[in-house]
From Swiss-Prot:
Belongs to the EF-Ts family. It comes from Stutzerimonas stutzeri (strain A1501) (Pseudomonas stutzeri). It comes from the Bacteria. Residues 80-83 are annotated as: Involved in Mg(2+) ion dislocation from EF-Tu. Transmembrane segments: none annotated. One of its GO terms (cellular component) is cytoplasm. Keywords: Cytoplasm, Elongation factor, Protein biosynthesis. It is found in: Cytoplasm. The lineage of its organism: Bacteria, Pseudomonadati, Pseudomonadota, Gammaproteobacteria, Pseudomonadales. InterPro entries: EF-Ts_dimer_sf, Transl_elong_EFTs/EF1B, Transl_elong_EFTs/EF1B_dimer, Transl_elong_Ts_CS, UBA-like_sf. HAMAP family: EF_Ts. It holds the Pfam family EF_TS. This is Elongation factor Ts.
Length: 287
């Protein structure tokens, strides 16, 4: 069993809103697996939902470029958000983006290799670690992009439509964070898990009900889940009366793909013991 650390309990508490003891008990029962603990807490009715997107900890910037039916998005990480706002870091990000775009790179490894000297120079100057983490390249009849500050970036490709529509949809993706393009893209495994959680949460409600009624209840929950997870089924942020897929169709367009980056998603950042850090600094001044 994985060690149940204070950091793990804290993360589960932040992601579920439950008390510290409840979170610790759930982690112990789940053998230290935080995702299983969340599923168990949902199944027991302790929580209705939890954002299961992993730890978002690293700092840095997202950058995008769209030109001539092509789009590129990259993520460059720093240790602090302060550095991400500095001109030297911004210049490194832009130069990396432009190089990758102009060389039509589709993988991050060649960019990391070619930018290593510049990266080392930046690290030496700023005193923080800097890394080019990832990139994605897209091509399409219409390509749109949206950048929310420096922390969230989106690329969208359309068949038909125009750049303004693509940008609107990209903005929606940034705000709503869909998991997949359409319901057909949701895995059977994920649907089965959602069904299992629904049955456990509603065991009392469905007890004694006819099988066809239970099936309709399950179908309703799954349809709701698919709508929440799928871009084309989500209510458009600018007009919730219209689904994103219908918005595209009305404009004579079809959404082909989307890519959404958020700074640091899935990267675990080391916990800082500020009390120990201050104590160490005080001790150092007394030497």
């Amino acid at each position: 069993m994985a060690e149940i650390t204070a950091a793990l309990v804290k993360e589960l508490r932040e992601r579920t809103g439950q008390g510290m003891m409840e979170c610790k008990k759930a982690l112990v029962a789940a053998g230290g697996d935080i995702e299983k603990a969340i599923d168990d807490m949902r199944a027991s009715g302790a929580i209705k939902a939890a954002k299961k997107s992993g730890n978002i900890a690293a700092e840095g910037s997202i950058a995008v470029r769209v030109e001539g039916g092509r789009g590129l998005i990259i993520e460059v990480n720093s240790q602090t958000d302060f550095l991400a706002l500095q001109d030297d870091f911004k210049a490194f990000v832009k130069e990396s983006l432009d190089e990758a775009f102009e060389q039509k790179l589709t993988e991050v490894a060649p960019l990391i290799a070619s930018r290593e000297s510049a990266r080392e120079a930046l690290v030496a100057k700023c005193g923080e670690n800097v890394n080019i983490r990832r990139l994605s390249a897209v091509e399409g009849e219409v390509v749109g992009a949206y950048l929310h500050g420096h922390r969230i970036g989106v690329l969208v490709t359309l068949k038909g439509g125009d750049a303004e529509l693509a940008k609107d949809i990209a903005m929606h993706v940034a705000a709503s964070n869909p998991a997949v393009l359409s319901p057909a893209d949701v895995s059977e495994e994920l649907i089965a898990k959602e069904k299992e959680i629904f049955l456990q949460l509603n065991a009392d409600k469905i007890a004694g009900k006819p099988e066809n009624i239970v099936e309709n209840m399950i179908k309703g929950r799954i349809n709701k889940f698919l709508a929440e997870a799928s871009l084309v089924e989500q209510p458009f942020v600018k007009d919730p009366e219209v689904k994103v897929g219908d918005l595209a169709k009305k404009a004579g367009a079809e959404i082909v793909s989307f890519v959404r980056y958020e700074v640091g998603e899935g990267i675990e950042k080391a916990e800082v013991d500020f009390a120990a850090e201050v104590a160490a600094q005080v001790a150092a001044t007394k030497k």
